[in-house]
Amino acid sequence: MPHIRQLCWVSLMCLSSSAFAANVRLQVEGLSGELERNVRAQLSTIQSDEVTPDRRFRARVDDAIREGLKALGYYEPTIDFDLRPPPAKGRQVLLARVSPGEPVRIGGTGVILRGGARTDRDYLDLLKTRPAIGTVLNHGDYDNFKKSLTSVALRKGYFDSEFNKSQLGVALDRHQAFWDIDYNSGERYRFGHVTFEGSQIRDEYLQNLVPFKEGDEYESKDLGELNRRLSATGWFNSVVVAPEFDKARETKVLPLKGVVSPRTENTVETGVGYSTDVGPRVKATWKKPWMNSYGHSLTTSASISAPEQVLDFSYKIPLLKNPLEQYYLVQGGFKRTDLNDTEQDSTTLALSRYWDLSSGWQRAINLRWSLDHFTQGEVTNTTMLLYPGVMISRTRSRGGLMPTWGDSQRYSVDYSNTAWGSDVDFSVIQAQNVWIRTLYDRHRFVMRGNLGWIETGDFDKVPPDLRFFAGGDRSIRGYKYKSISPKDSNGDLKGASKLATGSLEYQYNVTGKWWGAVFVDSGEAVSDIRRSDFKTGAGVGVRWQSPVGPIKLDFAAPIGDKDEHGLQFYIGLGPEL
């Protein structure tokens, strides 16, 4: 019987505690700003069903409040509890009134630097970040300063660094706090020799990818850059370059070991797509990311759509002295076109020399050969061309497949002359620009501009691929693909020797990955600039930020054109830059 009474008493206590927890709400008064936020963070671990008015819970809240205030320099708060009766249809309130009290202030920030840190600019700059004498103590400042010392050590290669002493002393009677840090960075390590394991590429090519010299002072960003450069070659499936610390403790010269695994020798990619310009399209690509120990690579692709069928290849030859940024490219292929008033069979071969600069710009010189049999309107010709050219381009972007910021610029000059066997003299100058900017996350602006100029004495012999046509998705929307150019006496398109088009598009983030768009495109493709024939199209569209890039649907119509009135729609997938 006594055991039964004890069990009943325990059960009543549990029921009573549960009832209180369900009917009591905790409230804290007297704090604001950072003090309030820090205390709330300390109290956030308490669930609403845990709140009770008993002494044990009050002690728990008291400890949490003191910890939150102590971290910000308030060591002697006054905390009073009051259990208030419930308002109408409400719960009881356990009120904690807090007075932070007098804060502890910084009385001194003693930091002694030893080893290489004494003269290292990054460490000396770090000393300037210490709080001023008299500022309120913040434990976070002290902890972050110590973390920064360690961060510099890891970034710059002070791998033997240690704290001889690190103490935060508080004199409560004086309400002052003192930093006492004695830090020895030790000697800075230097890069040693880099060795590679598992590579199918000759070692001398890999060594020329290393962005530092043996004996250079260690920088973690240089190690990261080496990993990036090796991956960027496309030769390897995996890349890991890591320091060998056990071989460097005495000399402080840190050898690196790169473990790589070759990429699959052959890959085949197939795809089916659709764009309004060319309709359904099937494409297959065969890649050999490395063909031999010199790092040569081959890409071959075939693309078939109703107006265009293309078979081409690209053979890349990296240069030993700079395999990633300098290389030769041999390209060739066959293309058949039947679009609007153009019928063309084109065979091409090109040799290009590329330089990828550290500024992001890419330069190239090239020599192209082509044999074209074509009918443009009422003119049929066969033209053989041999012409050199130069090109400079740069693409920058931030924000993934649908950039929030970026630009793409490309400028080129090509020159043909009968003196070396070409069938026609010409000069071609082209410039293409795309700019993307985003304001306040939701407002996105896309601007495009294209300029082109052909100077020749025999335009009829210039192949259609080199002539200019406007209209279509990336030109002037509201008009069909390549439907804008001068016409012959039969009303057939001839192509133009001058091109100028521009586009301004505004996109608004409606929700999540969905964007609405409004745009206006304008420009002309003419052969006589004295007979200007500007065309303008405007419309609206939708953008979806898919995992493989933006998918868009646009509707556009010509503006102020007495001959064109129809509504055009455009579906596309692919990068905007």
UniProtKB/Swiss-Prot annotation:
GO terms for cellular component: cell outer membrane; TAM protein secretion complex. The keyword Membrane applies. Disruption phenotype: 8-fold reduction in ability to colonize mice in competitive assays with wild-type. The mutant does not express the major autotransporter p1121 on the cell surface. Its main location: membrane. This is Translocation and assembly module subunit TamA. It comes from the Bacteria. Gene3D superfamilies: membrane protein fhac, membrane protein fhac: a member of the omp85/tpsb transporter family. It is found in: Cell outer membrane. Interacts with TamB to form the translocation and assembly module (TAM). The keyword Metal-binding does not apply. Component of the translocation and assembly module (TAM), which facilitates the insertion and assembly of specific beta-barrel proteins into the outer membrane. Promotes the secretion across the outer membrane of autotransporters such as p1121. Residues 1-21 form the signal peptide. GO terms for biological process: protein secretion. Pfam families: Omp85 (PF01103), POTRA (PF07244), POTRA_TamA_1 (PF17243). The chain crosses the membrane at residues 265-276, 279-288, 297-306, 309-317, 327-336, 347-356, 361-370, 387-395, 406-415, 428-437, 444-453, 500-508, 514-523, 536-545, 549-557, 568-577. Keywords: Cell outer membrane, Membrane, Signal, Transmembrane, Transmembrane beta strand, Virulence. Belongs to the TamA family. Coiled coil: none annotated. Residues 187-263 form the POTRA domain.
